């Protein structure tokens, strides 16, 4: 259920510029979104897996907080992330 090193590195370089820039909010949101997608697929196959559902909800909350922070700090970067990840609005 975790991201492979190759997928994680690709997401980091796409949103962070280089593979060392993991602390950037855009990178964190992108990694959360990728993990949410994988967990959603897992839960469709295993609907009674309550522990994974709780983990999914926690990651959704973390992504929501990171997006709220990004919206307050830099609205242009926030809108760009929403467009790149095909999220709401």
From Swiss-Prot:
Record-level Gene Ontology MF annotations: rRNA binding; structural constituent of ribosome
Coiled coil feature spans: none
GO BP annotations listed: translation
Record's subunit section: Part of the 30S ribosomal subunit. Forms a bridge to the 50S subunit in the 70S ribosome, contacting the 23S rRNA.
Similarity comment: family membership: Belongs to the universal ribosomal protein uS15 family.
NCBIfam families: S15_bact (TIGR00952)
Purpose of the protein: One of the primary rRNA binding proteins, it binds directly to 16S rRNA where it helps nucleate assembly of the platform of the 30S subunit by binding and bridging several RNA helices of the 16S rRNA. Forms an intersubunit bridge (bridge B4) with the 23S rRNA of the 50S subunit in the ribosome.
Protein name (record): Small ribosomal subunit protein uS15
Species per Swiss-Prot/TrEMBL record: Chlorobium luteolum (strain DSM 273 / BCRC 81028 / 2530)
Gene: rpsO
């Amino acid at each position: 259920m975790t991201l492979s090193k190759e997928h994680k590195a690709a997401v980091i370089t796409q949103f962070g510029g280089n593979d060392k820039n993991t602390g950037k909010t855009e990178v964190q949101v992108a990694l959360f979104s990728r993990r949410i997608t994988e967990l959603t697929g897992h839960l469709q196959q295993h609907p009674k897996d309550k522990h994974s559902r709780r983990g999914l909800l926690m990651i959704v909350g973390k992504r929501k907080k990171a997006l709220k922070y990004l919206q307050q700090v830099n609205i242009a970067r926030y809108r760009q992330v929403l467009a790149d990840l095909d999220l709401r609005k």
